């Protein structure tokens, strides 16, 4: 399983090994997860020759069917039984991984380069807000850059997981802020309070429903979200706007974001080199000129 190894940054043991159509196997995705392997399939089974190769590694191999309920955890299909929870490293940063978790195992690998840039763009004295934070990976990188972070998510278990990730990296969670609830309502509250941030990360799910039943759809409401965040941005600050919504094209996404922040500079980074298949991730850096 040495594919893509030369493309991966140092001190990283969690990355994509095979990326579907980009590696000539549409619908099949293989991720190295420290000393475990996760193979995900969409609309197909694992090719027999690939399964044989995976089994030959001697590592625990897990299979996840993406067309099923996205909240179902992967199933181990080969290798020794090791703890389902473990620590992986990305660019020298440690994260808790949980193979028993549904939806995702604790980190989105396609955001690796964005996390590095968040760290580079963070500094002591800065405040960074991470909305829809999941397990707080962006927050950890920002804090390692010296910023004070606010980690915002609707789910308390995600905030607890984020605290664990801070601790894994020698960061005292009590020196950071954690907010539970709907991101839109928190942004409105921050704006009313005059609370601002030097950096804001917006990476919402494609579809969500808050605790009051209010629906959020990226293709309909992302621009409104960016406009709300704009009211909380310090002059000269930056935002990272991303979405994996496949219904929304890159140009439509750019247009939606640009309309919400007229006069701001918009730039787009390439995908990480181990993600060579579908260019599905919409992503824009927004800078206050």
Q: Where are the predicted features?
A:
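C-terminal catalytic and target-recognition region of SAM-dependent MTase-like enzymes
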Residues: 238-289
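Non-catalytic substrate-recognition/targeting regions of SAM-dependent transferases
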Residues: 23-24, 28-31, 46-109, 116
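Conserved SAM-binding motif I beta-strand of class I
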Residues: 148-153
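Conserved SAM-binding loop of SAM-dependent methyltransferases across substrates and taxa
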Residues: 135-147
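S-adenosylmethionine
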Residues: 183-260
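Conserved class I S-adenosyl-L-methionine
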Residues: 125-134
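Non-catalytic accessory regions of SAM-dependent methyltransferases
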Residues: 1-34
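S-adenosyl-L-methionine
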Residues: 155-199
